[in-house]
């Protein structure tokens, strides 16, 4: 419901809505950068609560029940982000790995101010803390290319077994390798998404990775170019005047800044580390690697109320069912 101040001063509410649009647009733009994740299995909202509907239907995993979401300062952005990328590629030293599976990220966010009065955004993971989960990309003959073409005698037995058993394909899967950092509302400023890449083949064992939690690949993707902006207010503007969903669709994101560490844990006694690193040229410095993410759609459900924003947004979700 409008405040007495808004009724007496209609320009105040108009100004507040304009601020909502500007900051929300910047925030969802930043959220759109978080694209190296896949659809999270399981729903935080679904644990004891029906899924939201209408314009809020995409946000079933938003952790609105997490107490941390109530730490937002009054009048500052608080809400839910979901970002989906349809396709792309990840190249190391000119060797590309296609991204053919849709990738999704979704999390909660709130903002407050630091000791210098600057607005700071915080990331709140879903209830199951699976902020990043990707579908594996299958590379036919990938194990043979990475490991066996080297002719390294130390992997000859592995290669013979793989060829005999028809196990020469390779699965490549991106996993989260730490906390998202430097997240903020500036759509031209990338934030940092730490990842590691798991290489899976029966000959490699279950711990073959490029990058690790201690030495991750630090992705800093940026819009290039930004897609189409759309703004949807809540269907009940009297009850929820500060709640809306902003979307940016059809964006492309790129990053050429990240370095790629060497492979570790590959094969018995890690004998496959050396041929994998030699084939890919690992470790690979910044400037030699390239990430392209295409057809990215980012959504941001946000609340700028001056009270309990998380409660207000949750009420809007529940009213949409």
Language-model regions, residue ranges each:
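Extracytosolic secretory-pathway proteins
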Residues: 47-321
């Amino acid at each position: 419901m409008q405040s007495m101040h808004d009724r007496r001063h209609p320009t105040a509410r108009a100004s507040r809505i304009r601020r909502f649009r500007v900051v929300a647009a910047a925030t969802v733009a930043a959220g759109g950068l978080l694209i190296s994740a896949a659809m999270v299995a399981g729903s935080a909202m679904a644990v004891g609560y029906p899924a939201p509907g209408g314009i809020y239907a995409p946000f079933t995993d938003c952790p609105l029940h997490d107490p941390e979401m109530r730490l937002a300062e009054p009048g500052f952005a608080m809400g839910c982000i979901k970002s989906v990328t349809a396709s792309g590629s990840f190249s190391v030293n000119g060797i590309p790995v296609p991204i053919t599976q849709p990738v999704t990220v979704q999390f909660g966010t709130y903002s407050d101010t630091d000791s210098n009065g600057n607005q700071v955004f915080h990331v709140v993971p879903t209830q199951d803390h699976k902020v990043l989960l990707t579908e594996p990309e299958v590379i036919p003959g990938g194990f043979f290319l990475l490991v066996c073409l080297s002719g390294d005698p130390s992997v000859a037995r592995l290669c013979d077994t793989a060829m005999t058993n028809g196990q020469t394909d390779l699965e490549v899967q991106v996993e989260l390798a730490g906390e998202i950092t430097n997240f903020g509302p500036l759509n031209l400023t990338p934030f940092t998404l730490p990842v590691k890449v798991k290489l899976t083949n029966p000959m490699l064992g279950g711990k073959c990775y490029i990058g690790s939690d201690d030495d991750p690949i630090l992705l800093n993707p940026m819009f290039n170019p930004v897609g189409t902006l759309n703004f949807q207010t809540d269907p009940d503007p009297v009850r929820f005047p500060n709640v809306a969903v902003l979307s940016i669709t059809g964006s492309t994101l790129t990053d050429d800044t990240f370095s790629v560490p060497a492979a570790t844990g590959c094969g018995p006694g890690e004998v496959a580390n050396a041929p994998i690193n030699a084939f890919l040229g690992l470790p690979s410095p910044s400037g030699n690697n390239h990430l392209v993410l295409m057809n990215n759609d980012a959504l941001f459900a946000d609340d700028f109320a001056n009270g309990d924003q998380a409660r207000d947004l949750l009420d809007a979700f529940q009213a949409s069912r």
